[in-house]
Amino acid sequence: MSAVLKPKSKLLVCDGNEAAAWAVSLANVDMVAVYPITPQSSLVEYLAKFIADGRLGAEIVDVEGEHSVLSVLQGACLAGARTYTASCGPGLAFMFEPYLRTPGMRLPLVMTIVTRDTLTPQSVWGGHQDAMSVREVGWVHMYCESVQEVLDTTIMAYKIAEHHDVMLPVNVNHDGNYLSFGAARCELPDQGEVNDFLGEKDVNWHVALDPLRPMAVDPLTGGAGGPGPSTFVRYRKGQCSGMQNSLKVITEVHEDWGRRFGRHHAPLIESYRMDGAEYAIVTIGSMTGAAKDAVDAARARGDKAGLVKVKTYRPFPVEALVSALAEVTAVGVVDRSVSFGWNCGPLFQDTIAAMYSAPKRIPAMSFIGGLAGADLTVAHFERVIARTRELARNGGTAETVWLNEKD
């Protein structure tokens, strides 16, 4: 990313929650509905302050819980409003029913998940279990590595969600504790330039309420009978098409952002020191910084390590990831969550599923760490690199490795 401040930009030192709030303000949303929950709570406070101070001309709706949060915003979206919310953990679980309904209604809502681990045992600290638990519902999911990426991606999310080839809700996920409360340099773009980037808001969603154009929204639809046996299938197929269309749109929107603002974020995946790499580790979210340091140290020792960061997790960037990993001889995938039915991490599952279409079979190993706020340090990633290097050179059984088990 560029370290040169653009003439109309402002420089802040802020945490990820404040960065997300600034992005929502710059996107000129019409309605915000939120319910506070750790580690998202300060994001709600920033938004309330921006609205109270007149910085953001949006209506904020105070509700009794997360189920009502998304229910309220669904109605606002149907009326053509640009909307926003944020949640995590048990709050995300409480809103699951309307969360499930939102992509089915093809509503371009943007929501931040300030990721944390889930119950039980009790934990309010960082992890990816909450966001990973809803990965198959139909929302676009993008994971941020830095505070700056939180701000930039949240603004871009509106242009992605509202694109007529997509029309799906977008989750912008940043790590609880590490990004939510960790302060860093953040460049705040000019409001006029953001307005030009997003363009005129098109309130004519395909489901916008209009008394002159009546339609049935979310009617009872069966696969056998009802308004037509094929209706449900065609609707689901349309959702999948919108999701796959978003891969191209996400790439185009990130390229447009880079041209306008001079900050170039990887849209789908980021390849780091993959030239000539013998083996690679795959990361997601804020852990990537420490992982890059470990890769640099390995390269300095003469080890041909590389790294691929997944930015867009849903839809999963199969072609991009397979291409990036095509020449390596082993892969280590690091998750901050667990797929209990497979005794591995969800990102590992998706990575090996994608690699099934690769020209050659590449052995892979699952590493799980950073649960419940546990730190993933350079030393942890040096272990990941060592085990992946061993797999590349000696083969063997690719067991699941629990990184923080003896910390």
Task: For the regions a language model picked out, list residue spans one by one.
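Redox- and metal-dependent alpha/beta enzyme cores, enriched for Fe-S-associated oxidoreductases
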Residues: 269-303, 316-323
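Glycine-/acidic-rich phosphate or pyrophosphate-binding loops and their flanking alpha/beta elements
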Residues: 13-20, 255-279, 292
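Thiamine diphosphate
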Residues: 1-133, 138-139, 155, 175, ...
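Short helix-loop-beta junction
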Residues: 48-53, 250-252, 256, 293-307, ...
